[in-house]
């Protein structure tokens, strides 16, 4: 599970459905990304989209993803 991603979403007061809509994907696909079931290796397109949705630099998303990967 990508706890960091859930934390960002909650801080921005967004639902999974809202994030999915902003990314142009279904709520269930976004849920799978957040739960680590999809995009096990997050690609640049998804990382860029998340950075836009959460209004953070893409480098922040990449760093959080790398930290998460290293801790597993």
Each predicted region: which residue ranges?
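Short alpha-helical DNA-recognition segment
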Residues: 14-33
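A short, Lys/Arg-rich alpha-helix, primarily the initiator
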Residues: 1-12
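Helix-turn-helix DNA-binding elements, focusing on the entry/boundary residues of the two helices
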Residues: 5, 16, 27, 44-47
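Short, charged recognition helix plus adjacent turn
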Residues: 28, 40, 52, 59-72
């Amino acid at each position: 599970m990508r706890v960091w991603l859930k934390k960002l979403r909650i801080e921005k007061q967004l639902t999974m459905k809202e994030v999915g809509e902003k990314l142009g994907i279904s709520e269930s696909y976004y849920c799978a990304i957040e739960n680590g079931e999809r995009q096990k290796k997050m690609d640049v397109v998804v990382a860029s989209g998340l950075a836009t949705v959460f209004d953070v630099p893409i480098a922040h998303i990449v760093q959080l993803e790398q930290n998460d990967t290293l801790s597993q």
